[in-house]
UniProtKB/Swiss-Prot annotation:
Name of the featured protein: Thiamine import ATP-binding protein ThiQ
Gene responsible for this protein: thiQ
One GO CC term, this protein: plasma membrane
Domain ABC transporter: 2-230
SUPFAM superfamilies: P-loop containing nucleoside triphosphate hydrolases
Length: 232
């Protein structure tokens, strides 16, 4: 279970403050206007930002000040951060060992994830030889191979065409269910959120302004839709 209690980030001396509980295996969408604090929330969970106050626990363990490399969290961005001089296999392998010294079990795990992502025939290629969708599959494979209990997505598929974006969202949702991972996904699209998340959190002005069923946001009725700017 992920629990944030009054986690506070000072943005130009204006506090963003979040309290949130997410159960293990839950898939949650984080919605809200641009600049509301959605990415800040994910970066606080991942450890890329250090809170001024508050606490963050994962499965009852305090990770408020744990550095990103030691948190039980993986994060995927719109910019996939693949290393252009490394092959697909090497980029995925970094998720298992930064020195790329993989034992037989790790090699098998890497290839199993590649097969799951549908990129097992691309392992010898460089990122520059891949399409945008293929590069995001590689980046996702690198996240999943780490087998961390929490996966954070900061709009990684927003640049893809609608059909490919839906395919990637389905792949993420299925993978998280298989590995019993908790998923938090930032999105500007309520429709994308509804595809994989039954629960949504709406962020506004650096606060969690609403949380509940995604279908309520999609319906265009109620307070969540008003914050989000949807009218039914």
């Amino acid at each position: 279970m992920l629990k944030l209690t009054d986690i506070t980030w000072l943005y130009h001396h204006l506090p963003m403050r979040f309290s949130l509980t997410v159960e293990r295996g839950e898939q949650v969408a984080i919605l809200g206007p641009s600049g509301a604090g959605k990415s800040t929330l994910l970066n606080l969970i991942a450890g890329f930002l250090t809170p001024a106050s508050g606490s963050l626990t994962i499965d009852g363990v305090d990770h408020t000040t744990t550095p990103p490399s030691r948190r039980p969290v993986s994060m995927l961005f719109q910019e996939n951060n693949l290393f252009s001089h490394l092959t697909v296999a090497q980029n995925i392998g970094l998720g298992l060992n930064p020195g790329l010294k993989l034992n037989a079990a790790q090699q098998e795990k890497m290839h199993a994830i590649a097969r799951q992502m549908g990129i097992d025939n691309l392992m010898a290629r460089l990122p520059g030889e891949l399409s945008g969708g293929q590069r995001q599959r590689v980046a996702l494979a690198r996240c999943l191979v780490r087998e961390q209990p929490i996966l954070l997505l900061d709009e990684p598929f927003s640049a893809l065409d609608p059909a490919l974006r839906q395919e990637m969202l389905t792949l993420v949702s299925t993978s998280c269910q298989q590995q019993k991972m908790t998923l938090l996904m930032v999105s500007h699209s309520v429709e994308d959120a509804a595809r994989i998340a039954t629960r949504s959190v709406v962020v506004a002005d650096g606060r969690i302004a609403w949380q509940g069923k995604t279908e309520e946001v999609l319906s265009g009725k109620g307070s969540a839709s008003a914050i989000w700017g949807i009218q039914g």
